[in-house]
């Protein structure tokens, strides 16, 4: 088991990153945490407001592509955990270069800093989407990467950079590939918070095509526990770990479950035009992470009920995010479903 005195958490003001910081502060309070975050639209200082002014915590507003800044922060820590990324597939179809810059070049900057300062671990948070669409079976860590969107390709590129640093320079590398994650503090562009916040306002719940695309949904608390376990206990010799529940759920089930919890009519579901290159199914083999001692504690049903309650109880967090820019993006992304003329 590894122990750390000081960690740099890149992207710690985002959804999974802020929940990971919250986990560390509650379970490993002896670790000093520096959060580096660019505070793009999806990074929110309110996610970490409870830690401001507390001992052992520092927030730095900055970009992981800023080599001088990253080097100065890396000099004072034992390890880097990198959540920093552009992460939304839909936006990657509109602004692909931003994803390549952050997810590939930014990862390289962090790897170089970790190498230079002889860090004990560099942990890269990746995604199951690097495997591409899986029609049958489940993706294992050694499978070939076949990304099909600018987002998943940029994450795969970041992984390749990190693995190259491990092979060329001996960088002590760990990588997690998580499935679709949901829970509190998730920016309302991803499916679950879009459905919940739209349902609160009695707006249509958009589902691509016929809503049949299949995903594995893991609650953010479980995902963060798995990341923490990998960081502290996973052997470096075989560094990649899938994180998921093994339970497959399609969009129709998610939307109907949200409406049932909230007592809203199913007529709110609206099918919209499919996005280009939409992967129909992701599925992970999670044997390696379960062999390490992890298993999910929060079922999809329990997690969804808790998540609905959180958004209902925290309109002051999400309503300001649904601003003019948000709706501009929303209208560009969710287009009416049309049928071919006869």
PLM features: residue spans?
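C-terminal substrate-binding subdomain of Rossmann-fold SDR/epimerase-dehydratase oxidoreductases
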Residues: 20, 62, 79, 193, ...
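Short beta-loop-alpha junction of Rossmann-like oxidoreductase domains
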Residues: 133-135, 184-186, 190, 288
């Amino acid at each position: 088991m590894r122990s750390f005195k000081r960690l740099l958490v890149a992207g710690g003001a985002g959804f999974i990153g802020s929940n990971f910081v919250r986990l560390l502060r509650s379970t490993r309070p002896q670790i000093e945490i520096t959060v580096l975050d660019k505070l793009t639209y999806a990074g929110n200082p309110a996610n970490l407001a409870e830690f401001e002014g507390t001992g052992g915590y520092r927030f730095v507003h900055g970009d992981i592509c800023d080599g001088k800044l990253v080097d100065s922060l890396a000099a004072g820590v034992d390890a880097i955990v990198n959540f920093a990324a552009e992460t939304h597939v839909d936006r990657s179809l509109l602004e692909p270069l931003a994803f390549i810059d952050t997810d590939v070049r930014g990862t390289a900057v962090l790897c170089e800093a970790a190498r230079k300062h002889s860090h004990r671990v560099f942990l890269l948070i990746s995604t199951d989407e690097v495997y591409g669409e899986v029609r049958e079976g489940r993706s294992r860590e050694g499978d070939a990467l076949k990304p099909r969107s600018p987002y998943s390709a940029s994450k795969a590129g970041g992984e390749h950079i990190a693995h190259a640093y491990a092979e060329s320079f001996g960088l002590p590398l760990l990588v997690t590939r998580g499935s679709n994650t949901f829970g509190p503090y998730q920016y309302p562009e991803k499916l679950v918070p879009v459905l919940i916040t739209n349902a609160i306002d009695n707006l249509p719940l958009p589902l691509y095509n016929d809503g049949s695309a299949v995903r594995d949904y893991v609650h953010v608390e479980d995902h963060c526990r798995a990341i923490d376990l990998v960081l502290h206990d996973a052997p470096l010799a075989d560094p990649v770990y899938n994180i998921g529940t093994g339970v497959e759920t399609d969009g129709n089930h998610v939307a109907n479950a949200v409406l049932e919890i909230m007592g809203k009519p199913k007529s709110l579901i609206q099918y919209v035009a499919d996005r280009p290159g939409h992967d129909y199914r992701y599925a992970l083999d999670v044997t390696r992470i379960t062999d390490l001692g992890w298993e999910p504690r929060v079922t999809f049903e329990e997690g969804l009920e808790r998540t609905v309650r959180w958004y209902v109880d925290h309109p002051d967090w999400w309503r300001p995010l649904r601003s003019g820019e948000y709706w501009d993006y929303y209208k560009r992304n969710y287009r009416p479903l049309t049928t071919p003329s006869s």
